[in-house]
Amino acid sequence: MAGAVATVSVGLAWLGLMAAAASATQFRVGGGRGWSVPDANAEPYNSWAGRMRFQIGDQLLFVYPKEMDAVVVVDQGAYDACNTSSSVAGGGGGRYDDGNTVFTFDRSGPFFFISGNEANCRAGEKLVVVVMADRGGRHAPPPSPPAVPPPVAPVPMPSPASSPPSPAPAAATPSLAPSPVATTPSPSPSVSPMAPAPAPTTSTPSSPPAPAAMAPSPSTTPGGVAQPPPPPGTDGANATTPAAPAANDRSGAAAAAPVVAGVVVTSLGAYIGYAMLAI
């Protein structure tokens, strides 16, 4: 991937250079006479340069005899002093002695050229060129290739077994204790005075009826025969039936039982006595 990006960047830069070269203008310094000491009738180099419009990407062509001359790119101080031993290092500067030098302007601003022969420089073989800033983008320098980013190491995928970190437990908000609710005491049940239990009635055994009055003595009938008295119980007026004891009073019945038995025995005895008398 990185190699492909670098190849594309170099290709774009090369295309930019080719486009700039195709639209650039090459100027021959000195015309047909070339790079040499100008004569009295020739136009000075700086006057010629002042009439030209130099753009970034334009070129200067220096033609000279390489055994006798050279081209030196210097700064303004060396230009004024014709110091051939001081050349500008880098940026297209330096000393050229190949006899057919092509110099390309790679920036805007002034450029200073002098002859490699000091005597020729002092005789007027020197040149100042001011390159104009490129306002229309015609000779824009080729874009520098973009920096190739370093390969990114693959991020290891987390294993399925690894569980995501558990979120920090949220701080428990202390719960407010509920305000105590005043409880109204329920009224205690009023104790109603209990009615006094009725006193148990003591069953008084009814007194046994008085024994029946002794039967009247047998009356004497007119015939002189003594009539026996009627049996007890036959005369409703004279017979006295003992009152039956209360059914629900067991203690009274138990107490009256001997009395009743005595009355019965007495009545039977009287009846038997009357019977004996009648016989």
UniProtKB/Swiss-Prot annotation:
A GO molecular-function descriptor: electron transfer activity
GO-annotated cellular components: plasma membrane; side of membrane
Keywords on record: Cell membrane, Disulfide bond, Glycoprotein, GPI-anchor, Lipoprotein, Membrane, Signal
Chain residues in the propeptide: 252-279
Annotated disulfide bonds: C82-C121
Signal peptide range in chain numbering: 1-24
Family: Belongs to the early nodulin-like (ENODL) family.
Stated name of the protein: Early nodulin-like protein 18
Organism: Oryza sativa subsp. japonica (Rice)
Gene that encodes the chain: ENODL18
